[in-house]
Amino acid sequence: ATYKVTLKTPSGDQTIECPDDTYILDAAEEAGLDLPYSCRAGACSSCAGKVEAGTVDQSDQSFLDDSQMDGGFVLTCVAYPTSDCTIATHKEEDLF
C-alpha cells in the first residue's frame, strides 16, 4: 500500500506519497524535501517529528522511550506509514 504523508515543516506543509515499506525520511528526500537527520538508524533524535494524525510503525527505533512514543514522537528515519498520516517535522527540541 502507498499512503499520503503530510509533513508540516517550518517552510510549509508538503504531502508526499510513501509506500508502507519505505521509511518516511527516505520518501521525503526522494520528493525533494530537506528534513533533518543524523544517524539514519533510529538511534538519535535529529530526525524526530510528532505524529498529529494517522499511524506509523517505528519498531526499528531504539532511542525514544515509551512515554515519548505515547506522546506522538516519531523518528522519521525508521518510520513506515501504516495509514495516511500527518507529521510535524523538526521536533527534536520538544523531546527534552
Swiss-Prot record:
Name the residues that bind [2Fe-2S] cluster: 39, 44, 47, 77
Per the record, its GO cellular-component terms are: chloroplast
- Where it mainly occurs, coarsely classed, is plastid
What are the recorded Gene Ontology BP terms? electron transport chain
Q: Where in the cell is it found?
A: Plastid, Chloroplast
The UniProt entry, under PROSITE patterns, shows: 2FE2S_FER_1, 2FE2S_FER_2
Which keywords does this chain's UniProt record carry?
2Fe-2S, Chloroplast, Electron transport, Iron, Iron-sulfur, Metal-binding, Plastid, Transport
Q: Which family does it belong to?
A: Belongs to the 2Fe2S plant-type ferredoxin family.
Can you name this protein?
Answer: Ferredoxin
The beginning of the lineage is:
Eukaryota, Viridiplantae, Chlorophyta, core chlorophytes, Chlorophyceae
